UniProtKB/Swiss-Prot annotation:
Active site: 17 (proton acceptor)
Gene: pseG
Oligomer and partners: Monomer.
Catalytic activity: UDP-2,4-diacetamido-2,4,6-trideoxy-beta-L-altrose + H2O = 2,4-diacetamido-2,4,6-trideoxy-beta-L-altrose + UDP + H(+)
Name assigned to this protein: UDP-2,4-diacetamido-2,4,6-trideoxy-beta-L-altropyranose hydrolase
Primary role: Nucleotide sugar hydrolase that catalyzes the fourth step in the biosynthesis of pseudaminic acid, a sialic-acid-like sugar that is used to modify flagellin.
Homology family: Belongs to the PseG family.
Species for this entry: Campylobacter jejuni subsp. jejuni serotype O:2 (strain ATCC 700819 / NCTC 11168)
């Protein structure tokens, strides 16, 4: 089956969509991606053929599907609406798998919500009657190193681990770290695409209790070596749940609200930073 992922990444959007798509992509043998070449994107790190789009036009995507005869379109993109999905289906007949994080309407054959809070009944009336709904933690897309790390009982090197995703455009990592006691050893994980990286590096140099990890290869181990995690209410939550870690979730964008609400109801520590 020829599979096309439609997803983007950038310094503004972050890396979460592409990262989880790459986990799902391992389930298929013939995979390609269609992406906009945005600033700070992960295009060069995608180990599959990438079609660089020139616009957000749905017709450009439709033409690509027709020309390359893709059989399954996997949409992981907040900018593609239910009406766009209907148009794609009408024009191409391609099978559609749509990611969703906000309990929104979709016109797809398979609906995938990988967040722990999600349940199939949430989508009654929001998706076609014959749509296959895949929801909840059992469908979480977590990298293999987390499953391996969950078996390890690591010595705790750090009092706190902070990660606000790969780009952290609001520079919350620095803000959170500066509010913690200077007697605590704090690890901060980020990426080289973080627009606030120089500020973080300067902060780390001025504080000998800060350990800054940039593009670290094994985030799972770092998390497992920490007494408490302070993480964004994103896919990091599923990873923390798998590790059975002590964590606090920070909600700072709208698409994290459902996860944050669910965590709070379950008794987990949640903080909102808008």
């Amino acid at each position: 089956m020829k599979v096309l992922f439609r997803s983007d990444s950038s310094s503004q959007i972050g890396f979460g969509h592409i990262k989880r798509d790459l986990v799902l992509a391992k389930q298929y043998s013939d995979v390609s991606f269609a992406c906009l070449p945005l600033e700070g994107s992960l295009i060069d790190e995608i180990p599959y053929p990438v079609y660089e789009l020139s616009s957000e036009s749905i017709y450009e995507l439709i033409n690509l599907i027709k020309e390359e005869k893709f059989e399954l379109l996997i949409i992981d993109h907040y900018g593609i609406s239910v009406d766009d999905e209907k148009l794609i289906k009408l024009e191409t007949g391609v099978k559609i798998l749509s990611f969703d994080d906000e309990i929104k309407p979709h016109h797809c054959d398979i609906l995938l919500n990988v967040n722990a809070y999600a349940k199939a009944s949430d989508y009654e009336g929001l998706v076609p009657f014959k749509c296959e709904v895949r929801c909840g933690f059992s469908y979480a897309l977590i990298r293999e190193e987390f499953y391996q790390e969950a078996k390890e009982n690591r010595e705790k090197k750090y009092d706190f681990f902070i990660c606000m995703g790969g780009t952290d455009i609001k520079n919350l990592s620095l803000q959170i770290a500066s509010e913690l006691p200077k007697t605590k050893i704090i690890s901060i994980a980020t990426s080289s695409s973080n627009p606030n990286l120089k500020k973080l590096q300067k902060f780390a140099k001025l504080h000998n209790n800060i350990r800054l990890f940039i593009d670290h290869e094994n985030i799972a181990k770092l998390m497992n070596e920490s007494n408490k995690l302070i993480i964004s209410a994103s896919s990091l939550v599923n990873e923390a749940l798998l590790l059975k870690a002590n964590f606090k979730a920070i909600c700072y964008v709208k698409n994290q609200e459902s996860t944050a609400t669910w965590l709070a109801k379950k008794g987990y520590e949640v903080e909102y930073k808008y």
